[in-house]
């Protein structure tokens, strides 16, 4: 591995003989937020610098049992709570596709490694954007599965109501194969014919009153979608009736209760600032956020799936202030974690639907042409 890519992989694991199976011999990089027995797993933090898990996360075990070969753990920002991939403790993964620009976060090491051809497959996590955003930044493919479809056991929690584990690769076909292994379901056949696709040029907010960016970037895909038999229509998605950020901060504070504020000095300034804010969230606002989310998740779309860009702003530089760009940078992605829907990133294209099979079928159709 060259020095340029040294911060992508936090540690290399000696190769083992692969088991037979659909992933036989495919090299796998696991985000360092996910436990692997006997392999130091830091969660991107200084606090857990010497942590060695005594169990392997079920999602990882499924991939290994299918023949994947674990070759290392992928770098990430501290506790996966950063959308630009910056990590003051272990270095920041570079973007092989756009040098000098952010890799996105928080599954930054996975996406960068895939873009640099350092592995075949990646296993990441996504709470607000963290598989799809790095995939878009690095020109790779990543699936945020619908909430609950893949086990999150053995993963350090951020916001359990939103946390997901999902596959990353360089092709939709490989992502679909990994998804099949992770869920024990057959991968869907390619399909766009007869589907109604809603074109999103502005995402819904998460109820916080912000003005999300407008982007026409996904319009370049209209011709391809229509050529494959889809009907593309303008679309919008209603917004939750209350601000949902208090829910996010409330659960994040709970996830860190064992170490914050007791060990606050061992956190980076970035995450410490967020956790200090989380301590001040009003309980009434938290309750209102849960009620709003419950009602919002009942929304039934009037299209089969949506298409949007993953990123609605220019790609920030790698040394940007994460706190300044995080809301606009992830605006097209975060709402779908709250809704619990599946989101597939193919470079900067995002396909979204309530069901994993629908976005995978559409992505496979686009990939096969």
Please provide the spans of the model-predicted regions.
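Acyltransferase
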Residues: 213-235, 257-262, 285-303
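Short, well-ordered alpha-helical
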Residues: 1-52, 56-57, 77-82, 315
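Glycine/serine-rich anion-binding loops at beta->alpha junctions
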Residues: 78, 98-119, 127-132
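Short helix-loop capping/hinge segments that flank enzyme active sites or metal/cofactor-binding pockets
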Residues: 26-43, 247-292, 344-348
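Structural helix-boundary/capping segments
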Residues: 2-4, 65, 115-203, 219-224, ...
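Glycine-rich, small-residue loops and helix-cap segments
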Residues: 65, 119, 182, 284-369
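General beta-strand structural signal in soluble alpha/beta enzymes
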Residues: 30, 70-75, 123-125, 233-234, ...
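Short pre-catalytic strand/loop immediately N-terminal to key active-site residues, enriched for Gly-Thr
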Residues: 46-54, 91-106
């Amino acid at each position: 591995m060259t020095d340029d890519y040294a911060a992508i992989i936090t540690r290399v694991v000696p190769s083992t003989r692969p088991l037979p199976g659909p992933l036989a011999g495919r090299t796998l990089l696991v985000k360092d937020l996910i436990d692997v027995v006997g392999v130091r797993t830091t969660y991107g933090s200084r606090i857990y610098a010497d942590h060695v898990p005594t169990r392997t996360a079920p999602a990882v075990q499924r991939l290994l049992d299918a023949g994947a070969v674990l070759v290392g753990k992928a770098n990430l920002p501290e506790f996966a709570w950063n959308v630009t991939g910056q990590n003051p403790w272990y270095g920041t993964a570079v973007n092989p596709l756009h040098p000098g620009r952010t890799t996105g976060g928080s599954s930054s090491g996975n996406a960068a490694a895939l873009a640099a051809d350092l592995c075949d497959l990646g296993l990441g996590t996504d709470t607000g954007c963290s598989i799809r955003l790095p995939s878009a930044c690095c020109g790779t493919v990543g699936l945020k599965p619908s909430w609950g479809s893949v086990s999150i056991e053995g993963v350090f929690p951020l916001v359990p109501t939103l946390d997901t584990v999902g596959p990353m690769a360089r092709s939709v076909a490989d992502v679909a194969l990994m998804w099949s292994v992770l869920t024990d379901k057959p991968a869907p056949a390619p399909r766009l014919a007869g589907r109604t696709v809603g074109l999103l040029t502005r995402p819904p907010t998460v109820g916080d009153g912000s003005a999300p960016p407008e982007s026409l970037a996904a319009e370049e895909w209209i011709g391809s979608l229509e050529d494959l038999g889809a009907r593309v229509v303008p679309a919008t998605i209603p917004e939750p009736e209350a601000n949902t950020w208090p829910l996010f901060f409330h659960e994040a504070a709970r996830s860190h209760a064992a170490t914050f504020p007791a060990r606050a000095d061992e956190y980076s300034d970035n995450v410490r600032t967020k956790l200090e804010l989380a301590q001040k969230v009003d309980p009434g606002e938290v309750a209102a956020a849960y009620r709003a989310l419950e009602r919002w998740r009942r929304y039934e779309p009037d299209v089969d799936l949506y298409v949007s860009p993953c990123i609605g702003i220019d790609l920030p530089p790698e040394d940007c202030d994460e706190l300044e760009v995080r809301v606009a940078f992830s605006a097209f992605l975060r709402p779908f974690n709250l809704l619990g829907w599946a989101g597939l990133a193919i470079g900067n294209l995002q396909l979204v639907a309530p069901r994993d099979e629908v976005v995978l079928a559409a992505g496979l159709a686009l990939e096969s042409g």
